[in-house]
Amino acid sequence: MKTAQFYIFFFCWKAIWCNGCVLTNITISVEREECEFCISINTTWCSGYCHTRDLVYKEPIRPNIQKACTFREFVYETMSLPGCANQADSLYSYPVATACHCGSCDTDSTDCTVRGLGPSYCSFNERKE
């Protein structure tokens, strides 16, 4: 019986902590309207699960804050868009997460929508010459 309890405890622990909020490599599409094409770049962002709960009875004293996997720290990297050299502004800065945590989503710096356009959205299908 103790062996079964251990395995149940172990798998619950693994499900909660091993799938937590971690740095993840993603590919995003970068576009500049003047250049009329997109390129894909690799960056790091936060992804994973955070323990959260939704209260049945809402209390005004205790706010109901849903936690999401979001960045704790990030830096901006800048690159020059290839094929856009004749343009005045061929530089593009993008965020790179360096640390993650479970916390409330900061709408000032993050798209907190449930269904956004996604990181691979591009308004230009192919390069125009």
From Swiss-Prot:
Pfam families: Cys_knot. InterPro entries: Cystine-knot_cytokine (IPR029034), Glyco_hormone_CN (IPR006208), Gonadotropin_bsu (IPR001545), Gonadotropin_bsu_CS (IPR018245). Keywords: Disulfide bond, Glycoprotein, Hormone, Secreted, Signal. One of its GO terms (cellular component) is cytoplasm. It is found in: Secreted. Glycans are attached at residues 25, 42. Residues 1-20 form the signal peptide. It comes from the Eukaryota. Disulfide bonds join 21-69, 35-84, 38-122, 46-100, 50-102, 105-112. GO terms for biological process: follicle-stimulating hormone signaling pathway; G protein-coupled receptor signaling pathway; positive regulation of bone resorption; positive regulation of gene expression; positive regulation of steroid biosynthetic process; regulation of osteoclast differentiation; regulation of signaling receptor activity; Sertoli cell proliferation. PROSITE patterns: GLYCO_HORMONE_BETA_1, GLYCO_HORMONE_BETA_2. The keyword Disulfide bond applies. One of its GO terms (molecular function) is follicle-stimulating hormone activity. Together with the alpha chain CGA constitutes follitropin, the follicle-stimulating hormone, and provides its biological specificity to the hormone heterodimer. Binds FSHR, a G protein-coupled receptor, on target cells to activate downstream signaling pathways. Follitropin is involved in follicle development and spermatogenesis in reproductive organs. Heterodimer. The active follitropin is a heterodimer composed of an alpha chain/CGA shared with other hormones and a unique beta chain/FSHB shown here. Belongs to the glycoprotein hormones subunit beta family. This is Follitropin subunit beta.
